[in-house]
Amino acid sequence: GKGNLVSERLKDFAMHEFSLLDGAVLECGCVYIVKLLENVSLTDNLSGIANPKSSTGRLDVFTRLIVDGAQEFEDVPAGYKGPLYAEISPRTFSILVRTGTRLNQLRIRRGFSITTDKEMEILQKHVGLVRTEDNDSLPDKIKNGVPLSVDLVGENGLIGYRARKHTRLIDVDKPGFYKRESFWEKITIEDLVYQNNNSKNGTSSSGLVLSPDAF
């Protein structure tokens, strides 16, 4: 919060400290605060916005940036000079990390701008931000961004993957090392739930049930 240092708040709330120098396990369901190796020194016209790396999200590792005096996560205010911290909470898999492991990223920006729906419509028309498998530009109405939809047909009946509940530890610094089948089970069209919507003509619709806390 405003006027507070993260290091001082950790003295009040942290249960214990440990080193990441030789590697450490971050357990599923626990919350960790880690001081990052990097500091920033921004001028008054520069600010930052952070977000997890895509690989971090694919492992369901909840990660967000914290700075001293911040009132919002993931935000580095203009002119900030000081340390950076990450809140890390593995949700599905326990992970092995070490000093130098990269879980999130920071974008430095000058000023503030946002792409309007009109600008997105122009890009969609001339570039095709979203396309079909046949490379046709989709004409969907753009509102607060480009809409995306779930594919419940899939390729060869495969529509997604569900994380296994009991798996081995994942070393996040070994990309491409593990077999997908060890951590994920396939979701196919056979897993769809069908509901009879029209008893007169026997038509039905299908959907996928998403269980709470499943990934």
Put a short name on every predicted segment.
Residues G1-F215:
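DUTPase catalytic domain/fold
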